[in-house]
């Protein structure tokens, strides 16, 4: 669940609404499991009926095609902004391998920019949502960050949002990284990193607007570190009081 980091939703909403005013036509989003269903419902407009049907399992027209868990499935929709502008938003499918969706998002974004928008990097905006443990622990994040300014791979800057709940499954953050901040990987390219209290929704929206302005003006990556908490366990089967008894007291 997203409880403890719910401000991700107004952050995404603010980015999409304001980016549409700046001429962005498409958004490509990559994220893992945390908050995915919430995002699908509240940002992408996926019908609740569709989401709940995936909890009990459903048949597909293609008999040779097997389903996937609800936290892996992608979605594409057309969204009308508050200003009346139609934009297309795509949530890339992802596996259980955290952060591996990052380069996929970059590839989809670059392909759309090249094929449909005459290489105009301002028309397609990539947004990657990370977990604090994964962004610090998965080497693919560094690889993607290093692609930021390479001629063959650049997409005009990515907005990285970290849902920082200060715990990775059962690992305390002090046992999961050597750096001070989980977003320190962004310092490799001198990317601006905004640390914001996830409980302060207005501050989160302000940081999101700043990040968008920076990306659109300088065509560079920017990071937002939403410092919050995880109200419940890692998933439906995890009881966090066993492994973090003091934190969940």
Which residues fall in each region the model found?
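Conserved internal helical-beta-strand scaffold that buttresses enzyme catalytic cores
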Residues: 1-141, 145-159, 164-174, 178, ...
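Glycine/aspartate-rich loop-and-adjacent alpha/beta segment that forms the canonical ThDP
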Residues: 47, 217-249
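Conserved thiamine diphosphate
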Residues: 86, 181-207
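Acidic, metal-coordinating catalytic cores used for nucleic-acid/nucleotide bond scission
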Residues: 135, 201-204, 230
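Hydrophobic/aromatic ligand-binding patch that stacks against planar heteroaromatic rings
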Residues: 150, 185, 214
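Short, ordered loop/turn segments at secondary-structure junctions
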Residues: 163-166, 198-199, 227-229
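Acidic, Ser/Thr-rich peripheral helices and adjacent loops at domain boundaries
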Residues: 175-183, 187, 244-249
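Functional cores that coordinate and move charged inorganic groups
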Residues: 194, 202, 208-212, 216-217, ...
